[in-house]
Amino acid sequence: MALCLFTAVTLAQDKPYPIFTLDHLDAAMKTLGPNVAGIRASLDDGDFATAKARVIRSREQLAVTVTFWRDRGRDDAVTLLRTALDRMDALDAALSIETIDPRAVDTLATRIGGACDACHTIYREQDPVTSEYRLRQSALQ
């Protein structure tokens, strides 16, 4: 019995840490974008419950991307990511109170967009042929 337990523990230790690839990042960003846009649309419609649900989902989608940036030693990207997550948390909190202040949540949503834009300015570029966005090659070095 002890031998089986030792073998299981040893095998578990040998299992490599999951890798968050460029394809994973691309997929996360492509699903995150519409959710973030949906936050703004829901706020504009005064649909705070849907906006809150989109904030929660957006945060989940964005948070996992930290592995990509950490694995590449991009501390500035991790800082930008944490800023965006903190702003999403603030918007979630503002949407969780009984009487929601539309101006406050609008300001917080704008601040989330600013955090996204700050990272995208550094790490994203538009393909001149397809017009699709992609990660700058410098982010991979």
Role assignments for model-derived ranges:
Residues 1-8:
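Bacterial N-terminal signal peptides
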Residues 14-141:
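Sequence context surrounding c-type heme c attachment/ligation sites in exported
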Residues 10-12:
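Signal peptide processing junction and immediate N-terminal pro/mature segment
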